[in-house]
Amino acid sequence: TMNKQDLISKIKQLDGVTQDERAYLINLVNTKKKYGLVWEDKREDVEEQLRNNLPVLKEVKDKAIINGEDNPNHILIEGDNLHALTALTFTHEGKIDVIYIDPPYNTGNKDFKYNDSFVDKEDSYRHSKWLSFMDKRLRIAKRLLSEKGIIFISIDDYEQATLKLLCDEIFTEMNFVGNIVWQRSYAPINLKKTISQNHDFILIYCKQEFATLELNKLPRSE
């Protein structure tokens, strides 16, 4: 999926169209309205590196843990997550059944880096940077999911509503499975001026309609 600037660049390169036709198409892109999120896409340095370089995974044999030939093989990848996800599209596209991610929550408290710099609460492009960051990675994650694949995404109140809209756009509302609310703190906390929060969320989406998923396998407990 192209962002607006990439689409406009493609239109400018089209052959066989007049200047008036080109101007009309660009105006159409600029004025098109849609339901959902709109943000200013922010380029990442790691994304620019992918334009001319192919990420390659290198095995570090002295860190291997041998667990027997008949046991499952697992891979631990160290590196930038956008590079790692891109590399996996060459080997695991459409092959992964379950993905769990715990992305930066974008609280403004030095939990989110963009181009090697922390994004703080004073950054006027804070939400655009976070959305650009998440959009690129979630679209690749969707490619990695198998047809019966499902993804779990941890988040808190800062970006939960925004993330839901973004995921509805990427995975479609039809593939929204549910939103788990879980208690992350049991100690009394009074850090908020209004309502104290002791919970986080896990958004769940599947690649295809979740009617194909085998749900409700555990009996209801006391």
What is the role of each PLM region?
Residues 104-107, 158-160, 185-187, 208-211:
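Conserved nucleotide-binding/hydrolysis micro-motifs of P-loop NTPases
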Residues 120-144, 191, 196-202:
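Alpha-amylase-like alpha-glycosidases and glucanotransferases acting on alpha-linked glucans and related
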Residues 1-100, 106-130, 136:
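DnaQ-like (DEDDh/DEDDy) 3′-5′ exonuclease domain used for proofreading
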Residues 127-180:
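Conserved Class I SAM-dependent methyltransferase catalytic core
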Residues 187-222:
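Flexible, glycine-/basic-rich loop-and-beta segments that form/coincide
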Residues 88, 108-115, 163-165, 179, ...:
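Short, solvent-exposed loop/turn and secondary-structure capping segments
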